[in-house]
Amino acid sequence: MAKRPHVDRRKFLAGSAGAMGAAFFRGAPLDALTSRIAVPQSQVWDSGLVRHLLPTVSESRILLKVSFEQALSAAPTLRVGARSFPGRMNDTAGRFWQFYATDLDAGVPHSLSLVAANGSSLCEPWTLSTFPPVDARPERFRLLLFTCAGGPEGAYTGIGQRRGNLPTAIRNRLLRRGLSFGPDACVANGDHIYWDLHSWSGQRTGALSTRAETSNFDFSGNVFGSSNEAALMLAAGPQIVPVYGADFRSTPVFFLQDDHDHWENDAAGAFPIAWFQLQLARATQQLYYPEFLPEANRPLGLPWSSSSDRGDLSESFGTILYGNLAEVLLYDVRRTMTLGPQAVFLDPNVE
């Protein structure tokens, strides 16, 4: 068996960074760059009733998070080839669903379709590949990484002329530019939303922020089944749905949560996060982007990882395992970091 050539990690990282910068920017202004990007995938793929669709995969499993333009009164179905997997409702109205497919063939493209309870198509079929088996020897693996794609709609009219966050249309174009390089997977490294509930500067330190007052959350209540549910969707939805749409339907995504995903800035005193904001973070994940699928070498009993009829999904610990070529461990520590003399980032069970 031929040996793989030795790869110097420093040279690899330096070369990768240079190639990424040249490929993405080439010295061009942002507006000129985005104007050259191809027609959005959603314009050549019939999304039907689908508002947004984000998948993740392992070698034998697929997990989808999907929202629809209207509530569905009965559970839709995900068809993977000739097999069917029922949807599970993630909200209380029937607009947000998840689909979990198991025991799939590894390393092959699968034909997927979403159908309503009456058998009608909810969108055009598409393909999504599972990862190669752990003993496979793939020749290449390309990973797209980015961070801080959230934020309410802003305005951009040219270099030095940005107000607030970038418009969601430009964020979407940048991500589609990344997708044009054909990544095998994508890591969204936190800050998918910016809607901090407290102020952490000046005389208002610790007081409710203007955005918190706008949302008018009931901090003593549950997220789902109350006005809190609608307030969450009004705050988070416009920061996620138009940025991703269904453009990542054929690219597995891995979403880590950072400080702003817990509806707070990581200023001193803000963490460990308050119970209600922790529930908001969990609910946002439940609605919009997939948790991490099981992996045989991941220890059981990690924080925010559970055994259920969906297997050992984790909200905070993930693995990208691409044959024997790439293994990427993903750890989210925002929920376990503490302050004080005995402060830690990782829960003792993780240590």
Regions found by a protein language model. Name each.
Residues 28-38:
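Signal peptide processing junction and immediate N-terminal pro/mature segment
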